[in-house]
């Protein structure tokens, strides 16, 4: 069985990044111990999550559940602009109410294998 590297860190309840890259190195499959939301703003990008590949278009929103193996595939030097949210699992659980599951978008993406 292949071992994937855990990457990234989250010392707060959440972090938000706005990134633009036009010459990115190849990124290997990896996972995080927090949830990730990615909003694709531009770029010629595919995103692989748990064995499924999604071709992204501007304004696509990608949900990556904590622990899911994923990686972006950057196809060319078109600027890859995105907003990324890292969200602690505990943070969502702390604010969850009986009739309001804040992690439902991540659970549904995983269950339905439809992350975009």
Summary of predicted features, one role per range:
Residues 51-65:
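Short acidic-glycine-tyrosine-enriched beta hairpin
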Residues 22-24, 58-59, 67, 88-90:
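Tight coil/turn sites that cap or link beta-strands
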Residues 35, 39-45, 89:
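Glycine- and acidic-residue-biased ligand/ion/polar-headgroup-sensing regions
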Residues 9-11, 32, 48, 56, ...:
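A generic fold-level signal
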Residues 1-16, 69, 73-116:
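A hydrophobic/aromatic-rich effector-binding and dimerization subdomain
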Residues 15-32, 44-46, 69:
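Conserved short histidine dyad/triad with adjacent acidic residue
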């Amino acid at each position: 069985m292949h071992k994937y590297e855990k990457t990234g860190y989250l010392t707060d309840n959440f972090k938000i990044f706005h990134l633009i890259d036009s010459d990115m190195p190849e990124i290997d499959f990896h996972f995080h111990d927090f949830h990730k939301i990615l909003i694709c703003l531009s770029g010629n990008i595919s995103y692989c999550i748990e064995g499924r590949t999604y071709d992204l278009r501007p304004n696509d929103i990608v949900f990556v559940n904590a622990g899911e193996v994923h990686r972006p595939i950057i196809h060319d030097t078109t600027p890859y602009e995105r907003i990324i949210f890292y969200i602690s699992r505990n943070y969502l659980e702390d604010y969850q109410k009986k009739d309001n599951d804040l992690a439902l978008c991540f659970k549904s993406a995983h269950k339905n294998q439809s992350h975009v």
